[in-house]
Amino acid sequence: LGPIQKAVFDEYCSEALDALTDDIDAIYLCHHGAMVAEHLDDPDGYIAKEIRKKIGPKVPILMTLDLHANISDTMCSSVDLICGYRTNPHVDQFERGQEAAFSLRQILSGQANPKVAHVKLPLAPSSITLLTATGPLGEVIDYGQRRQAELGGKIMNVSIFGNFICSDVPENGISIVVTARNDFDIAKNLAEEL
């Protein structure tokens, strides 16, 4: 355990970026979201940013992340949608992948032009307090899902990330990420409400 060695991270990024071609319709990143490297506090954000630089603004990038991800502004500004697990213990990875695929279909068909809003809270609770069947995190996740339903098709995704306390990085802390279908203000308002 510990930070990823720079040489290993650089090799991974080089292989991933070299594999991207001009005929790609979309990118799906399935990461944990709390990666740390010897030379980077936010490797997940770095990867998303470098992919965005290589493929340009028109190719959608979607990301599914563990509920314990440490979310950065770089991640949120580099991708079109972030979809986080809603359960701890994690039992909904498959459903979040389906949700990301459904969202991608909407984006590719022109039914959505996603806008991502991110609010970081100055809290970094320990993992034991992040159970979702009971307790405050589960209640907030449930409330976010109810608000998404109330707003109808205006919101594509509401994800609340508890953080990964063992990663001693500036990105650590609770994050609320809301993706609106096409209106940043709606996403930002809901993220701030939550």
Feature roles, as predicted:
Residues G97-A101, R105-A149:
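Conserved anion/nucleotide-ligand pocket segment
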Residues I128-L194:
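Hard-cation-handling environments
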Residues P3-C13, L17, T21-S109:
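Active-site histidine-anchored catalytic micro-motif
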Residues L65, R86-T87, K120-P125, A180:
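Short, structured patches in soluble enzyme cores that scaffold and shape functional sites
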Residues L1-C13, V177, K188-L194:
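Acidic/glycine-enriched edge-of-secondary-structure segments
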Residues V79-G84, V119-L123, V169-S175:
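Short acidic (Asp/Glu) and glycine-rich catalytic loops that position anionic groups and cofactors
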Residues A34-M35, H39-D41, K115-T132, V158-G162, ...:
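Short, charge-rich amphipathic segments
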Residues L29-H32, H118, D168:
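Core alpha/beta catalytic barrel or barrel-like domain that forms the active/cofactor pocket
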